[in-house]
Amino acid sequence: MATAQLSHCITIHKASKETVFPSQITNEHESLKMVKKLFATSISCITYLRGLFPESSYGERHLDDLSLKILREDKKCPGSLHIIRWIQGCFDALEKRYLRMAVLTLYTDPMGSEKVTEMYQFKFKYTKEGATMDFDSHSSSTSFESGTNNEDIKKASVLLIRKLYILMQDLEPLPNNVVLTMKLHYYNAVTPHDYQPLGFKEGVNSHFLLFDKEPINVQVGFVSTGFHSMKVKVMTEATKVIDLENNLFRENSTTEIAHQGLDCDEEEECNDHIQRMNFVCSQQSSECSRKKRKVSEPVKVFIPNRK
């Protein structure tokens, strides 16, 4: 299903009046708007190319020669409404400078198994000027440093989306039934204890990911506006990826592909580990004690009979 939809999603559109991102970024407000749109566009690309929701749940926007599908409110599809509320919750936490990381996770066992199929991680960091956003669908990236001009920011954004599209095309199709959730992690020092964005509740701060088979970690991209930056990563089982390395390296940029666990935050200063028993991916280390972070999570969304 995802492959079939791809041909509709990536189309050449030479004369476009509607654009995805602002043409100029000169202050923090414009930068925040850019990061929000890049985040929402990334989530939309993932859900569309993985075939999670019907065509009616998407509108169309344009980015250079790409015709993108962007999630919109579709009352006939409750699942898409849930995702939009999650995105809006992330926006609120971003505006308040609370959000450290948003993790979108896909499971394929509706009976309650916690075995992960795919994970997309978005990290956010805040500088004196503003925030930085890392999108980790577990890889790395084309990097443009803070303070670069608008053209460089646009190039980095377009390349990130293109590489995300390539990655989605190279993943095996999902089964008919999928369970979706998103966890939000915060900066404890600035986030009120009782803070919860709309659509979220207090969550469990777990650093373990359980895969059936060995996972692969792919850093897709990094974009910096001078006020905010975004990094993109993806994690899935290595056996589910089709010719990923060859296709990503066609994009004249650096792409890191590694068999490893989640990236540790700089604050945590600990190493990644994969425990071979059941391929449990963990960010925890016996040599690294970490403070318990505040986490929010929504009700999981079950998406049945996608075909």
From Swiss-Prot:
Keywords: Chromosome, Meiosis, Nucleus, Phosphoprotein. It is found in: Nucleus; Chromosome. Residues 29-234 form the HORMA domain. Pfam families: HORMA (PF02301). GO terms for cellular component: centrosome; chromosome; cytosol; nucleoplasm; nucleus; synaptonemal complex. Phosphorylated in a SPO11-dependent manner. GO terms for biological process: meiotic cell cycle; meiotic sister chromatid cohesion. The keyword Protease does not apply. Disulfide bonds: none annotated. Highly expressed in testis (at protein level). Expressed in lung adenocarcinoma and squamous cell carcinoma (at protein level). Expressed at lower levels in the liver, brain and kidney. Essential for synapsis surveillance during meiotic prophase via the recruitment of ATR activity. Plays a key role in the male mid-pachytene checkpoint and the female meiotic prophase checkpoint: required for efficient build-up of ATR activity on unsynapsed chromosome regions, a process believed to form the basis of meiotic silencing of unsynapsed chromatin (MSUC) and meiotic prophase quality control in both sexes. Required for the DNA double-strand break-independent, BRCA1-dependent activation of ATR on the sex chromosomes that is essential for normal sex body formation. Interacts with HORMAD1. This is HORMA domain-containing protein 2. It comes from Homo sapiens (Human). The gene is HORMAD2.
